[in-house]
Amino acid sequence: AKSYGASSEVEVFDSYPVLTNSVEETEFAKALALEVFGEEGVLESISPMNASEDFAFMLQQRPGCYFLLGNGEKGGKGSCMVHNPGYDFNDDIISTGATLFARLVETHCR
């Protein structure tokens, strides 16, 4: 801002809760993901992320499971995380992702 002759103030709010998945819903989502993607398509352990996520507020009220849906192969289309200027959504995963989400809803509603 200063280089353009303006000023700015930054306030940092440390108010996001830790996002913690409930065990039962995580196992439910994992089982269906394994049906849809197979063992080779499901990563069970990733490094913890230091980011804020609004879904954490929802998980304070109801049990649930936040998961990531892969978007591409390393170095290929869709390999950047969202909120990155190099991000390019991989349209090829739309039907696969929709299949998983539909299966989650369908199975939950039985």
Residue ranges: model-predicted function:
Residues 1-110:
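Metal-dependent amide/peptide-bond hydrolase catalytic core
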